[in-house]
Amino acid sequence: MNNNYHTQINRPNMLNEIAANNNLLNNKNNQTNQLNNNQYNNQYNNQNNNQNYPQNYPQNSQQNFQQNSQQNHQQNYQQNYPQKFPHQQNNITEDLVDIELSDSKESGSEYPQSVQQTHQQPIQNNPSIPNNQPNQINQYNQQPNQYNHQQPNQFTQNQPNQPNQPNQHNQYSQHNQPNQSNQPNQYNQNNQFAQPNQYNQSGQLNHTNKINKQIQKQLDKNQPEKIPSKPEKNQKQSHKPKLPPTMQHGPLPIHGMPIQHMPPQLPMQTEYCKKSNSLFDYIIIPIALVLVFLFLVHPKTFQNNW
């Protein structure tokens, strides 16, 4: 039962594939061999997709396949269609000229004469090809420059000894004036610091200095004289040696090294043992040490002696 069920369902699909293959073989035998392998495979796949499931793949439908084939044909093979472009001659825009393009490699007799002339002119005027014919399109380039040739130069005409004359264009320029560096500075007239001895000429600065000195003298007289304070008798004066100012804050800095601020170092205080004059230190202690040595270290010698 299962085998019959599956064969009944798959039978229409198999028949469709067989029919599609037969159609492709017949078409291939009838047509000339113009299709490549890629085009043949695409056509085979598109036919199968259209027959079996065109709804799932709308891009593979027959209409899209025809449109794509037409576009590819237009790109690969140039069709005979008119192309228009403006043609200029003698500074007059003529009517648009129709040009037909074709694949045939024939002589240029099919093109109109006006188009043949335009194609032949740049070849004749090419500098690499020896030809002395004038270029009709570039007639404005052959005309002399009105400003450089026809009109005389106003600055150079009928002026004798032109290099010795002063520069007319730069006559207002300060850099071209003679001895400009020796002239007084015009821009620093209002600058008080630029003019020399401005205050000394009028005498105001010297007068103010005298007044300030007199005021300082009066203030010094009014202030009481400062008497140095004497140390009291009860206060003990320190007899520490005075260090130089460079050594108060540690050693001198080394060249290229930062200064290390260290606290002042106090002098070292050495403690000496007190002198002992008692008999205890010189007599009793040595006798006790000898007895300990005899009883503990050498007991045999002690017994033999006694």
From Swiss-Prot:
Coiled coil ranges: 13-39
Record flagged with keyword Ubl conjugation: no
Main location: membrane
Segments passing through the bilayer: 279-299
Any one annotated GO CC term: membrane
Compositionally biased region (Low complexity): 119-201
Organism ancestry: Viruses, Varidnaviria, Bamfordvirae, Nucleocytoviricota, Megaviricetes
Subcellular location: Membrane
Keywords annotated in UniProt: Coiled coil, Membrane, Transmembrane, Transmembrane helix
Organism in which the protein naturally occurs: Acanthamoeba polyphaga mimivirus
Basic and acidic residues biased stretches: 218-235
Protein name (Swiss-Prot/TrEMBL): Uncharacterized protein R335
Region (Disordered): 44-76, 103-204, 216-249
Membrane-related topology note: Single-pass membrane protein
